């Protein structure tokens, strides 16, 4: 398991430390993050708490900035967990400090965006499944991120996956890397694993969402300051890649 950059996971310690939120409300928030209820009635049924209390506690969370409501025409209340502005500002400050330690950068941005868009908490990063083996070398091939319970893998395809760069010592080495990518996709298909390739141009929240296969459930997103900052980091990386295209700069990216 790796560090998660999901907003609600990062914000949870602040909620638990808050003296203004009841124990019941804190428990409901955790449950909301886990099950993404379709309505207050659904949340009441799942929690075993009466609908009257659920509404009261959820309204308290909303008033403190921990939830947002979207009331549909059917009068169902769609609940989206988030975090107050002050908490998000603290998380953005922390995020801006820690992102400078990321490497490879493009792959790390992809993973942070998936944390905030895919509603599957368990995944493996940089894993080498025993059944995805290069038949020539006998070595296992690596997925950047693998949602093993749903059979979906994500691969960040840096420029070195598409053309020869300074990272390749020869044309033969570049061709070998391309062959490993093709073998990985072929073996994955044989084992019913869908491999999604992400490029630098995809590192926007809205673009990432369009790349997520139907077999993966989506997370409800509240586009507050933290998610906007994450999206901004993706835009900065896209700009950096465009600016340095053609230069002899060692690009970062996923490992084969």
Regions found by a protein language model. Give the residues of each.
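Short Asp/Glu-rich motifs
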Residues: 63, 80, 206-208
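Short recognition helix of helix-turn-helix/winged-helix DNA-binding domains
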Residues: 1-42
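A short, conserved structural fragment
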Residues: 62-72
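Nucleic-acid endo/exonuclease domains
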Residues: 87-256
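Short, hydrophobic-biased segments on the C-terminal half of alpha helices
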Residues: 55-59
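A short alpha-helical element within helix-turn-helix/winged-helix DNA-binding domains
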Residues: 35-50, 61
């Amino acid at each position: 398991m790796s560090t998660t950059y999901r907003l609600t996971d990062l914000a949870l310690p602040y909620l638990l430390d808050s003296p203004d939120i009841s124990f019941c409300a804190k428990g409901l928030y955790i449950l909301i993050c886990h099950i993404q209820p379709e309505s207050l009635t659904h949340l009441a049924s799942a929690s075993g708490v009466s609908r009257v209390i659920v509404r009261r506690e959820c309204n308290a969370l909303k008033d403190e900035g921990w939830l947002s409501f979207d009331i549909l025409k059917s009068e169902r209340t769609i609940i989206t967990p988030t975090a107050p502005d002050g908490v998000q500002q603290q998380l953005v400050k922390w995020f801006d400090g820690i992102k400078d330690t990321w490497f490879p950068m493009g792959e790390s941005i992809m993973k942070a965006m998936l944390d905030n868009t895919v509603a599957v908490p368990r995944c493996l990063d940089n894993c080498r499944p025993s059944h995805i083996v290069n038949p020539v070398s006998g070595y296992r091939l690596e997925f950047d991120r693998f949602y093993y319970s749903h059979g979906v893998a994500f691969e960040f395809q840096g420029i070195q996956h598409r053309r020869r760069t300074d990272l390749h010592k020869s044309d033969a080495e570049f061709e070998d890397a391309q062959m490993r990518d093709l073998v990985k996709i072929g073996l994955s298909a044989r084992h019913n694993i869908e491999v999604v390739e992400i490029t630098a141009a995809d590192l926007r929240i809205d673009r990432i969402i369009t790349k997520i296969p139907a077999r993966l459930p989506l997370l409800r997103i509240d586009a507050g300051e933290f998610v906007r900052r994450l999206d901004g980091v993706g835009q900065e990386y896209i700009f950096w890649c465009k600016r340095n295209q053609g230069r002899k700069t060692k690009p970062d990216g996923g490992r084969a």
